[in-house]
Amino acid sequence: MNQKIRIKLKSYDHNLVDKSSERIVRAVKATGAVVSGPIPLPTEKEIFTVLRSPHVNKKSRDQYQLCTYKRLVDIYSTSSKTVDALMKLELPSGVDVEIKV
């Protein structure tokens, strides 16, 4: 096949992203393909500021933060075994996977 497969992983939990990327790398290396990664991409941080009280005390606020962790895995010199290994791989439900061929 000799084409490049790019896999992007996203999750709110960095442990899930790291474990999922390691499982992908192990499965792909077992088929003999060349793997580049996992490459950590910048973390997106969303900060929400909310009033503590519904009526008064404008100065009293809470801040909440939502972090999105991302990893990138590139696979080169793929074969049909590599694609089959990726299809059979089961990842946790908290991980968003984007695959580009």
Swiss-Prot record:
Output one GO MF annotation.
Answer: tRNA binding
What is stated as this protein's family in its record? Answer: Belongs to the universal ribosomal protein uS10 family.
Q: Which domain of life is it from?
A: Bacteria
List the SMART domains: Ribosomal_S10 (SM01403)
Organism equals Cytophaga hutchinsonii (strain ATCC 33406 / DSM 1761 / CIP 103989 / NBRC 15051 / NCIMB 9469 / D465)
Per the record, the GO terms for biological process are: translation
Q: Which InterPro entries match?
A: Ribosomal_uS10, Ribosomal_uS10_CS, Ribosomal_uS10_dom, Ribosomal_uS10_dom_sf
Q: What is the official name of this protein in its record?
A: Small ribosomal subunit protein uS10
Q: List the disulfide bonds.
A: none
Q: Whom does it interact with, and what assembly results?
A: Part of the 30S ribosomal subunit.
PANTHER family noted in UniProt: 30S RIBOSOMAL PROTEIN S10 FAMILY MEMBER
Which N-terminal stretch is annotated as signal sequence?
Answer: none
The family database entries (HAMAP family) matched by this protein are listed as: Ribosomal_uS10
Chain's gene name:
rpsJ
